[in-house]
């Protein structure tokens, strides 16, 4: 039977911004939330070509090493005018020899849109896929999406990644201009984690 020993769950990430988002959304659960960084676990390279493939890779690898239930996450930005790029390569677009530079990545998105000769609005989705792996091999999958559009120039300093160029549907400000609390209510990661919360609550009732 799958369970949560000692009410612990491992989040397979070294990304502090992502981890804080997880903790904020899951704060009402009776769970001790640990990260790969807390346990000194290396992050596997994202070698798959789908969100679910990369999330599963991270979840299984970290679960096998820690012997704890583990949530692996892969998320990204799909810009429709760019054929859903950067997609699973969202983080790669920010890669530099000195680490990730998301200002560079956001500039690349906008420059690619200008080269595409397509007209605004430049619709896009943020996608989050979560894979929950238990030490016995059982697995659950949760997905969330946030629809919106790309804007320029960069707006706001909040959030992380591409947040300052993404305006969610129904709003006139970017994720980067929102408070963490406001963003977390509508984000793709929130929608995926709400599905996990429903699973967790059903499991414990």
Question: What are the roles of these predicted feature ranges?
Answer:
Residues 2-10, 16-205:
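Anionic-ligand binding patches
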């Amino acid at each position: 039977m799958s369970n949560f020993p000692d009410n612990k769950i491992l989040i397979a990430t070294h990304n502090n911004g992502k981890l804080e988002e997880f903790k904020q959304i899951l704060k009402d659960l009776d769970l001790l939330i640990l990260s790969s960084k807390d346990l000194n676990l290396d992050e596997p390279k994202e070698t798959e070509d789908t969100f679910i493939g990369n999330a599963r890779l991270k979840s299984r690898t970290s679960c096998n090493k820690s012997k704890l239930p583990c949530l692996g996450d892969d998320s990204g930005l799909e810009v429709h005018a760019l054929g859903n790029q950067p997609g699973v390569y969202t983080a790669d677009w920010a890669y530099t020899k000195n680490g990730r530079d998301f200002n560079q990545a956001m500039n690349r998105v906008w420059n690619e849109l200008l080269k595409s000769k397509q007209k605004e609005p430049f619709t896009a989705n943020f996608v989050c896929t979560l894979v929950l792996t238990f030490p016995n091999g059982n697995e659950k999958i949760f997905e969330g999406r946030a629809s919106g559009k790309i804007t320029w120039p960069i707006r706001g300093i909040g959030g992380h990644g591409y947040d300052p160029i993404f305006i969610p549907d129904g709003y006139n400000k970017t994720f980067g201009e929102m408070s963490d609390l406001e963003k977390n209510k509508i984000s793709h990661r929130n929608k995926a984690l709400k599905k996990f919360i429903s699973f967790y609550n059903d499991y414990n009732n």
